[in-house]
Amino acid sequence: MTNGAKLLIKWLKENVLNTYQEPVNSNASLPYISLSYVENEFASQTAQQLTIWTRSDSSYSEAYLYADKLSKLIGESGVLVKDNDLGTIVIYKGSPFCQNRLDDTTTIRAVLINLLITNYNN
């Protein structure tokens, strides 16, 4: 796993919800975020998609609570995330920022989050 992936996962775990790189271990407990990290050249912006997974029979409301929390953390200008060991990334909202994921099960509700990540790691 690259430092950019480690830094994004660490930041999401500390500020939003447990986060795992895909494939997620089958014993992970809902709710959580999953991602398949994408990294581009130094200082280039890359699209990154996250999935927020929750359990509910009928509502996406819990998933949207986490999406709202993430949206507030990122703000309208993005958020700079720095770590002495892992480097620096800047996270921006993608477009669309959030959308329902149509699920095959009646008890899992998930939303897709689109981000733009600028990676300043070598």
Annotated model-derived regions:
Residues 1-20, 26-29, 34-122:
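Charged, amphipathic alpha-helical segments and their flanking helix caps
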